[in-house]
Amino acid sequence: MNNNLPTGSIAAAVDLLNKENVIAYPTEAVFGVGCDPDSETAVTRLLALKQRPVDKGLILIAASFEQLKPYIDDSILTAAQRKAVFDCWPGPVTFVFPAPATTPRWLTGRFDSLAVRVTNHPLVVALCNAYGKPLVSTSANLSGLPPCRTVEEVRAQFGDDFPVVEGATGGRLNPSEIRDALTGELFRQG
C-alpha cells in the first residue's frame, strides 16, 4: 500500500492519524514524525521507529495554545512568564510546562513536565486544526542519521511507503529552541 500523501492532503493524514499511524510532515526547520498523543499504540510505534526510550519524554506541536491545555498545567505561571511564552508563539520555540497527573506517561516519560510548541508552519497548523488536537512531534530521522529536510530524505530513511505530508519546511536551519516556561532556562539552542 502506498501511503504517500499528495500536497495538501490533510484529510488523508487525519485518516491515518485516526488509525493510530505515524506520519511525517514539514515543520519550521526539519521534517517531523508524529502521531496522536492520546494513543499509546501510536506513540509506541513512533518510539520504536525512532529507537527512542519512552523515559526521554516527547514534544507536542499544536495549532493553538487551547489545543495544548489538556496536557499541561499553566496555572502556576505568573503574568510575566505567560507573556514570555506568548511573545514567542506561534513560532519555533518549545516550552517545557508542568504536566498534570492526567497527562500520559508515554508523553512525559520520567518527567513531571511536557515540552510543547504552538507552530507557525501553515501546513502543520492546518493538520492540527483538522485533527482537532496537537500531535506528538519529533525530528524525522532514524537513530544516528541527520534529521530529514526534504520529502526525498524522509523516503530515503523511512521507505517509499511511509506516509508523508508533502510540503516545504519553514527554512530555519536549526530545530526549535527549548526553554523552561517557569524559569526561562535554555535547554536547547534554536
Swiss-Prot record:
InterPro entries: DHBP_synth_RibB-like_a/b_dom, Sua5-like_dom, TC-AMP_synthase, TC-AMP_synthase_SUA5. This is Threonylcarbamoyl-AMP synthase. PANTHER family: SUA5 (PTHR17490), THREONYLCARBAMOYL-AMP SYNTHASE (PTHR17490:SF18). Residues 7-190 form the YrdC-like domain. GO terms for cellular component: cytoplasm. The gene is tsaC. Its EC number is 2.7.7.87. It is found in: Cytoplasm. It holds the Pfam family Sua5_yciO_yrdC. Keywords: ATP-binding, Cytoplasm, Nucleotide-binding, Nucleotidyltransferase, Transferase, tRNA processing. HAMAP family: TsaC (MF_01852).
